[in-house]
Amino acid sequence: MNEELLKKMQRIKPEISNEVTDKGYVLTLSGRVSKNYWEDDDNICVETIDNELKDVEGDITIRLNSGGGDVFEGIEIYNYLKSLDNTVIIEVTALAASAASIIAMAGDEIKMSTGS
């Protein structure tokens, strides 16, 4: 992998946030795909996503920006999202590389921002 690209991927600021809009529930996932091994980890993991989405009714939009990470965690997140009865819309806001590309494929609809 290109060293410059690797450095850019590592600089993606971790963020997990949510909001309810007139179009449904929006979950922003930014950062590394990996299990949370420590209490203060901010990784994108199935446990965090389950905590955010388990009681959501209606459409779910996931805004995704990640350089990837643990492929097995990515597969677990994919399987979790596919198991939901909700319509899942994935919006790739900048980057969905490696394990994050697996997560992106879980959407019933996938939108890519210009330049992503």
Model feature map: region roles:
Residues 1-99, 105-116:
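N-terminal organellar transit peptides
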